[in-house]
Amino acid sequence: SMSPDGDTITLSSLKGKKTKLIYFWASWCSFCEEENTDLVRIYKKYKSKGFEVYAVALDEDKEEWLSSINKYKLAWINVSDLQGWDSKYVNTYNVSATPTTYLLDKENRIVAKDLIGYELERELESILNYTGPVN
């Protein structure tokens, strides 16, 4: 999908990042306002440790999408095909509401769904601080 600058950024390009959150949201989604604020805080805290957010907006209006990105200062990866609920991601990830989140591991496998706030932080702590089995 396209970034605001028109670049195509794929999820597969994020392989190797320790963990990433696919975040389905939209500028018209009132429940996403709180989620945006919370995620921005969590993103700032864990970004340097290998956490990335891949935010897929189910918007159709590019101006509204961009205006929301600026309003909430969403500095992570923002993409949208501006197809709303007809977005290919909706089927691929079985999204039926916004916000919906999937936490992915290094290999882009889904490890958790719809974790927010403290629960998300706890999971991130566990993933990002895991150094592998002790020999």
Labelled PLM ranges:
Residues 10-33, 39:
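Short active-site neighborhood of thiol/selenol oxidoreductases, capturing the structured segment around
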Residues 24, 54-58, 79:
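The conserved SAM/SAH-binding core of class I Rossmann-like methyltransferase domains
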Residues 2, 78-81:
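Short acidic-hydrophobic, aromatic-tinged amphipathic segments that line or gate anion-handling sites
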Residues 21-22, 53, 101:
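Hydrophobic beta-strand anchors of alpha/beta hydrolase catalytic cores
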Residues 74, 81-128:
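Thiol/disulfide oxidoreductase modules built on the thioredoxin-like
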Residues 1-13, 125, 129-130:
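N-terminal "domain-start" segment that seeds a small globular fold
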